[in-house]
């Protein structure tokens, strides 16, 4: 994701002095909104834990692209900060997912239940990581999301900002539904592994 964002930034620098710069900005905004919007249905109907995290990355790439497309100093700063914040939060989340899938021997969300009671430490860290990646305050991604949204409103893009907030709410609802279901749902009747990581 960071490499893709770097590629967009390089192109942004190249076209910045051209007469088509405004068109390029609108193109980035369009791709950003599309990326966030298209991630939501896939998140809401997902059955695979790691694919769920992958579609979350699609949403976050949209946020970065959107910040670059707005084109103000504030939004670009927010986009650059979001690249760093996402890398930290998503790395932690994929690590937790690796431990969870190793313990339960499956990536199927429906078969992962009772994380907090089965692996208290891992379950707690998983919840924290999901809260972080969805931009819940006071975690780092909240800051970069807030900066980008603020840039939309201060640059006069009120409707766009309001729409993006609604999309963020959809992503948050989907991610937290799966997170809480896996963390506090009834324990499965069988366990395929006896790994005790996080107990």
For the regions a language model picked out, list residue spans one by one.
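Glycine- and aromatic-enriched alpha-helical transmembrane segments of multi-pass membrane proteins
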Residues: 197-199
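Hydrophobic transmembrane alpha-helices and their helix-loop junctions in integral membrane proteins
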Residues: 1-186, 194
